[in-house]
Amino acid sequence: DAKELADPAFNAQKQALKWGLAGFSSTTVWLVFGAFIFALGYEVSGLGRRIALFLVKFMGKRTLTLGYAIVIIDILLAPFTPSNTARTGGTVFPVIKNLPPLFKSFPNDPSARRIGGYLMWMMVISTSLSSSMFVTGAAPNVLGLEFVSKIAGIQISWLQWFLCFLPVGVILLIIAPWLSYVLYKPEITHSEEVATWAGDELKTMGALTRREWTLIGLVLLSLGLWVFGSEVINATAVGLLAVSLMLALHVVPWKDITRYNSAWNTLVNLATLVVMANGLTRSGFIDWFAGTMSTHLEGFSPNATVIVLVLVFYFAHYLFASLSAH
């Protein structure tokens, strides 16, 4: 800012480099990275697929309960998978996509109405709900908290976020699958094929492996520390501790982590965006923008102001292909 530039001892080149790399020291960025490695653990160990198949087996005899199963699967994986692409697209979808062909239901075809259309719609609903319910359910959530902390100085914990969203989340969990079933009712409402197929797949996978049991233990440990240990240990330290234990206990090989492009791309992108947010604050742009917007919205009722801001946010998304960038 102006005061720094006026200081004779100010070294522009040194401070520019320090500022440019500051994002990589953000605890939020490393929390997201750690959660991505958790997601990799679900994939490598096969635990994510096993959870999905288990719920499909016991809830798949009715199409409606199968819809609930899809949402529950996503919610169970969401606390440790901050990428809805990796979670819904990489873990849940490969299981669910095998179900419509069992009933000769195919995309871009009238047969999609049999069951495929409903299941795919539930995939969209499940990823939207699970991404919102947990801070670590989607990278933009964590990035947004970082911005709130940098700009407004407000700290929101993992547990606070979850408890605030929980009432709405429970209502959506109960209503969304049923309402979708009513508005877009599939032609096939009962079947034994889905549960039978999932049971056969589980038999093929065999019993829980050592890596799966280890990952379950690490998941429970991390969740417990995030919820109850926030006063003792930082959330990021919990995530990095879990990653270290996953490596030490051979749940995820180091070579798989180095090849996990999504995690490294997110690390670099989020760190860069954190730096940009900090720069906008220090340069005074945030104060200027807030003042300008408040001038234009002066005289509006609180409800009208919220509507305008939501519309601006909504239509601005057309300019971005990434939620994190948006």
Predicted regions: what they are:
Residues 1, 20, 178-185, 208-213, ...:
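Flexible hinge motifs at transmembrane-helix junctions and intramembrane kinks/re-entrant loops
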Residues 84-88, 103-206, 214:
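Juxtamembrane and boundary regions of transmembrane helices in multi-pass small-molecule transporters
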Residues 66-70, 120-123, 168, 211-222, ...:
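Hydrophobic alpha-helical transmembrane segments of polytopic
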Residues 74-78, 130, 168-176, 180, ...:
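Alpha-helical transmembrane segments of multipass membrane proteins
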Residues 116-122, 215-216, 258-268:
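Alpha-helical transmembrane segments and their helix-start/interface "positive-inside/aromatic belt" motifs
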Residues 2-108, 260, 264-266, 270-326:
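Membrane-embedded alpha-helical segments and adjacent helix-loop junctions characteristic
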Residues 14-27, 154-167, 207-210, 227-238, ...:
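Interfacial loop-to-helix junctions that mark the boundaries of transmembrane helices
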